[in-house]
């Protein structure tokens, strides 16, 4: 078989249906739109979410809450994730970002106390939970608020 002998698979190249091209095509006269009505007209059709005059779902659902424009996004990191750093290292939010422990620093990083810490580290973060602070100091490290 050579390149010039290649043929597309049967049924792979179908011609587009030409609507409104006579009754013999099967898509003549009304071109698949039925008779009259809003959807038969040029440019006709209902807007998204329209339910025929019935109160639409979006308006039937109650309004709830609001979006706080001043919210702070604090990134939480559990203490067990800090074991990947070498003994005696200073762990900063930038170091966590570089090590891909977190995807972004947001408005601050908070260290939480889930898991165990086997390394002695100096951890710098914007906030610490009480258990995280205890575990860092129990492992011989320091917890510094920045």
UniProtKB/Swiss-Prot annotation:
GO terms for molecular function: rRNA binding; structural constituent of ribosome. Part of the 50S ribosomal subunit. Residues 21-31, 42-52 have a biased composition (Gly residues). GO terms for biological process: translation. Keywords: Ribonucleoprotein, Ribosomal protein, RNA-binding, rRNA-binding. Pfam families: Ribosomal_L27A (PF00828). The lineage of its organism: Bacteria, Bacillati, Bacillota, Clostridia, Eubacteriales. InterPro entries: Ribosomal_uL15, Ribosomal_uL15/eL18, Ribosomal_uL15/eL18_sf, Ribosomal_uL15_bac-type, Ribosomal_uL15_CS. Belongs to the universal ribosomal protein uL15 family. One of its GO terms (cellular component) is cytosolic large ribosomal subunit. Residues 1-66 are annotated as: Disordered. Binds to the 23S rRNA. This is Large ribosomal subunit protein uL15. It comes from the Bacteria.
């Amino acid at each position: 078989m050579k390149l010039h002998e290649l043929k597309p698979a049967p049924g792979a190249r179908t011609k587009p249906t030409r609507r409104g091209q006579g009754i013999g095509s099967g898509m003549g006269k009304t071109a698949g739109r039925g008779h009259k009505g809003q959807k038969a007209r040029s440019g006709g059709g209902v807007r998204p979410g329209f339910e025929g005059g019935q109160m639409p779902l979006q308006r039937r659902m109650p309004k709830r809450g609001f979006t706080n424009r001043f919210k702070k996004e604090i990134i939480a990191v559990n203490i067990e994730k800090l074991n990947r750093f070498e003994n005696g290292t200073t762990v900063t939010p930038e170091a966590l970002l570089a090590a891909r422990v977190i995807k972004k620093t947001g408005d601050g990083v908070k260290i939480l106390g889930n898991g165990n810490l086997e390394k002695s580290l100096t951890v710098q973060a914007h906030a610490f939970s009480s258990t995280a602070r205890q575990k860092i100091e129990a492992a011989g490290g320091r917890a510094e608020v920045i």
